[in-house]
Amino acid sequence: TDAKPTVCIIFYRSYLMAADLEPIDQLFSDFKKRDIKCISIFVNSLKIKSTAKWIESMLSKISPIAILNATAFSAKSRETGKSPLDHVGVPVFQIILSTSKKESWRRNPIGLNSSDLAMHVAIPEVDGRINGGIVSFKSEQAIDPALQFPISKHKVEKTLSKKIINKVEKWHVLRSKKNEEKRIAIVLSSYPGRDFQLALSLIHISEPTRPTP
């Protein structure tokens, strides 16, 4: 048997049909350099029942240490409230193939545009996804002589791709540790207000986190 740890990347079939796989290929290459095996699965949608069931079956066979999800929005079923990505109980990282160009991202004070924030950050967080970060931006190619228009494809950002690999590796190391070896920090917000209201609404939140004797 192959003793190498395995990660699974899930992405849209449309990327394959459009030969727009540069960010996926880059992740494969980066994982290989870290001696991590990589398997990819392409889908039309994670919400199709037959697809979701097949995904669960495949993930059980693959037994990945982590899943990288490049599909957008929520993957939870309306009927069950469950996502096929949660079937094997490993961290699921939401990776972002941005719909905007790098220049737009740099100029935007909040980085991603509103569509990307909704599709790849806010809604996936409701599913319990871990934000993996951006792996690529849209980039127009030269005008295709046959089609007579510039084809827009995803251009990988290698520095950001490596950050995703680092994050996956660190989560794997963390999961391998015993609970008593872990140190957890809980960061609570304290919105502006009067001094006597400082942290008032959070006063009981810390109680359940205290160790029991």
Task: Tell me the role of every PLM-derived stretch.
Residues 1-25, 32-33, 192-194:
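A short, flexible N-terminal coil/short beta segment enriched in small residues
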Residues 25-39, 206:
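Short helix-loop-beta junction
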Residues 17, 33, 37-59, 177-185:
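Metallocofactor- and cofactor-centric catalytic cores in central/energy metabolism, strongly enriched
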Residues 15-18, 46-49, 74-77, 100-104, ...:
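Flexible loop/turn segments at secondary-structure boundaries
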Residues 39-42, 47, 55-62, 76-96:
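Internal alpha/beta domain cores that form substrate/cofactor-binding pockets in large enzymes
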Residues 63-67:
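Proline-aspartate-enriched helix->loop->beta-strand connector
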Residues 203-213:
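Single conserved hydrophobic/aromatic residue that forms the stacking wall/gate
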Residues 1-6, 84-86, 92-94, 99-185, ...:
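Flexible inter-domain linker/hinge segments
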